[in-house]
From Swiss-Prot:
Belongs to the KAE1 / TsaD family. Its cofactor is Fe(2+). It holds the Pfam family TsaD. One of its GO terms (biological process) is tRNA threonylcarbamoyladenosine modification. This is tRNA N6-adenosine threonylcarbamoyltransferase. Required for the formation of a threonylcarbamoyl group on adenosine at position 37 (t(6)A37) in tRNAs that read codons beginning with adenine. Is involved in the transfer of the threonylcarbamoyl moiety of threonylcarbamoyl-AMP (TC-AMP) to the N6 group of A37, together with TsaE and TsaB. TsaD likely plays a direct catalytic role in this reaction.
């Protein structure tokens, strides 16, 4: 089965072809037009997707060495994301599917991230043998879920204010690192001292009594931003510049420690022996190494996507579509067009999907 996946939920325009479970192509174009604005401008993102979508899809099909008529299924992100950006890929995909007489599969962007560690062209590809805890962490989302083999899941924790990726970008902006700042903080942190300053770790065992913490898997990063701003205002610019790497390491440590602590605690509480980490922040080297070390200490198996599949990409959309079909979550014979895009992630906090 040949599946074309299309992803346009934020500022990456991507198309990929999956053939019988193997990635044949994965073309990603990251928009650079937002740098001067310090964040993604929704209208600019939509216009860039409109400008690039045809050439990106054509490139993915060409690299896969197939013809459009060889496609069996077309899938695209239906949300969550910037609604105008989502609509570009969704409408294009539905139109192409209709024109070719092929079934269309709408995919939840966050769910695609959850299963991205299992994209089948990874070296040493493997999957959990049972249920697992998923940490999905990006610029827009920070979710902790317990995932079942039938693709159902229960969200047990989410951010109550800012996402972890947003915390990286906004604190980095305060340090004058530009946008996106996450990768720059990661690079600087390797040269800095994470013990230079201890920024707050909200909603963790170290920040409150064990009784109030137990079972609380929500996240909060707004206090970290405030703490960083307060620290910067109390020190002159020369001192800040001198210790930029130390500050980056301290900020990264504060974010990573929370993510790791809650993920491992969730796995132990729910008695699962596997954790997956996905989303753009899963590319962070500090998170990868700290999560691996914590999992090793507790005998938990760790699954993280290859770097190419950590950030937004269409291979994960095509892979999710394949899983939905294979595991009975989507029936091709029930195919319909005119799917409504959605901006926000809607998942029940209690009860399985």
């Amino acid at each position: 089965m040949n599946i074309l996946g299309i992803e346009t939920s934020c500022d990456e325009t991507s198309a990929a072809v999956l053939s019988d479970g193997s990635v044949r192509s994965n073309i990603v174009s990251s928009q650079r037009c937002h740098t001067d604005f310090g964040g993604v401008v929704p209208e600019l993102a939509s216009r860039e997707h409109e400008r690039l979508i045809v050439s990106i899809v054509d490139a993915a099909i060409t690299e896969a060495n197939i013809a459009k008529n060889d496609l069996d299924v077309i899938a695209a992100t239906a949300g969550p994301g910037l609604i105008g950006a989502v609509m570009v890929g969704l409408c294009f995909a539905e139109g192409l599917a209709w024109a070719l007489g092929k079934p269309f599969v709408p995919v939840n962007h966050v769910e695609a991230h959850i299963f991205s560690p299992f994209i089948s062209d990874e070296p040493g590809h493997r999957e959990p043998k049972g249920d697992f805890v998923s940490l999905t962490v990006s610029g827009g989302h920070t979710l902790l879920s317990v995932v079942r083999q039938d693709l159902g899941y229960e969200v047990i924790g989410r951010t109550i204010d800012d996402a972890a990726g947003e915390a990286f970008d906004k604190t980095g902006k305060m340090l004058g690192l530009g946008y996106p700042a996450g990768p720059v903080i990661d690079r600087l942190a390797r040269e800095g001292d994470s013990d230079f300053h201890r920024f707050p770790r909200a909603l963790t065992a170290s920040s409150q009594t064990s009784k109030s913490y137990r079972g609380n898997f929500d996240f909060s990063f707004s206090g970290l931003k405030t703490s960083v701003r307060t620290w910067l205002e109390a020190h002159d610019s020369e001192y800040v510049q001198k210790h930029q790497a130390d500050l980056a390491a301290s900020i990264q440590s504060a974010i990573v420690e929370v993510l790791v602590e809650k993920s491992v605690a969730a796995a132990l509480l729910h008695k699962v022996n596997a954790i997956s980490v996905a989303g753009g922040v899963s590319a962070n080297s500090g998170l990868r190494s700290a999560m691996q070390a914590a999992c090793d200490r507790h005998g938990i198996e760790l699954f993280i996507p290859a770097l190419a599949y950590s950030t937004d990409n269409a291979a994960m959309i095509a892979t999710m579509a394949q899983l939905m079909i294979a595991r009975g979550k989507y029936r091709i014979e029930d195919n319909s067009y005119g799917v409504a895009p959605f901006a926000r992630f809607e998942a029940a906090r209690k009860g399985a999907r």
